[in-house]
Amino acid sequence: MIFKVIFMNNQIPLLGITGYSGSGKTTLLEKLIPELIARHIRVSVIKHSHHNMQVDKEGKDSWRMKEAGSSQVILANDERWAIMTETPKPVSLDYLAQQFDRTLTDLVLVEGFKQEPIPKILLHRQEMTKPLPEIDEYVLAVATNYPLEIDRTLLDINRIPQIADFIENWLHHFHGAR
C-alpha cells in the first residue's frame, strides 16, 4: 500500500477530454496544446482509438521485426523515437500513463477513455443529435457552444484561453493538493 501511495503522489496528472464522436475533441486538443505550451505547461497526450492501428508500414524494417515476433520495436532517428508494443490484451490507462517521461511532461491530456475514473472536461455541441451525456462525479467542467444550467463549471468550447485558464488553475490545485 505504501508503494501505491508513493506512486500516486508522483503521478503525472491526467485530464480527460471526453464527448461523443463529432463533439470536437481532437480539434479542441489541436488548439489547446499550443496554448498550454505557451504557458510553459509540458503536455503529452494519450488518444484512444476503436480502430486497429498500424504505426509502421508493411515491408519496412520495423514492421518486419514485429512480424518476425518481436514483442516490442523501437524506431528511432535524431529527432524522435517511438516504441511499438504488441499487446495480447488491452492495457490500462494507468499503465499507458506510466510510460511518459516525467522530465518532459507536466500534464497528460487523455482523449477518449470516457469510462475511466479520471478528472475530465466533457464536450458537447448544440448541433449534435445526441443529448448531453451523463455528467458523472469525474466531470470537472462542461465545454459547450450553448448556454446550459449545470452544477459544474461551464466553459465556452470556442474560447481556448478560457479552457486553458481552467486547466492551468486545476493543475495548480492538483500540485498544491499533493
Curated annotation (Swiss-Prot):
Keywords linked to the UniProt accession: GTP-binding, Molybdenum cofactor biosynthesis, Nucleotide-binding
Pfam families: MobB (PF03205)
Domain of life of the organism encoding this protein: Bacteria
GO BP, sorted A to Z: Mo-molybdopterin cofactor biosynthetic process
Leader peptide range in chain numbering: none
Binding site for GTP: G22, S23, G24, K25, T26, D56, K57, E58, G59, T103, L104, T105, D106
Family (UniProt): Belongs to the MobB family.
PANTHER family the UniProt entry points to: MOLYBDOPTERIN-GUANINE DINUCLEOTIDE BIOSYNTHESIS ADAPTER PROTEIN, MOLYBDOPTERIN-GUANINE DINUCLEOTIDE BIOSYNTHESIS ADAPTER PROTEIN-RELATED
Functional note: GTP-binding protein that is not required for the biosynthesis of Mo-molybdopterin guanine dinucleotide (Mo-MGD) cofactor, and not necessary for the formation of active molybdoenzymes using this form of molybdenum cofactor. May act as an adapter protein to achieve the efficient biosynthesis and utilization of MGD. Displays a weak intrinsic GTPase activity.
Subunit structure as annotated in this protein's UniProt entry: Homodimer.
Protein name according to UniProt: Molybdopterin-guanine dinucleotide biosynthesis adapter protein
Annotated source species: Haemophilus influenzae (strain ATCC 51907 / DSM 11121 / KW20 / Rd)
Lineage: Bacteria, Pseudomonadati, Pseudomonadota, Gammaproteobacteria, Pasteurellales
Gene: mobB
